[in-house]
């Protein structure tokens, strides 16, 4: 699933573990399970990505944000992070964002639905210049 950076031939858990290893992060199975739990995916950890709905795939991808809270990540660049998420997924995503901001992280995200976010933000309007 190139849209979310997930391998359809691996389980949700295996995807997260592989991604963490590729980053060079030393994470325990408990860390990975907490990451999945942060986006309400723990009960789906043994599902193959090919069996997941688009919303579950998005949640699986967003679980990586939780892992970045455990390391010295200072910046998140996110493109339409709430696409395919249901209301519960958006609430869980907001909690991750809020926690990251409280830890002095910076988030740059592209989104058409700013009303979905329940945290303080600075809006930058980047209009294209016409010649």
Pin down the residues of each PLM region:
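Q-loop/switch helix immediately C-terminal to the Walker
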Residues: 3, 8-25, 31
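ABC ATPase signature
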Residues: 10, 52, 66-69
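Conserved ABC ATPase "signature" region
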Residues: 17, 29-44
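Conserved ABC ATPase signature
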Residues: 48-57
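Catalytic Walker B motif of ABC-type/P-loop ATPase nucleotide-binding domains
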Residues: 74-80, 85
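Conserved D-loop/post-Walker B switch-helix segment of ABC ATPase nucleotide-binding domains
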Residues: 86-95
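H-loop/switch region of ABC-family ATPase nucleotide-binding domains
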Residues: 109-113
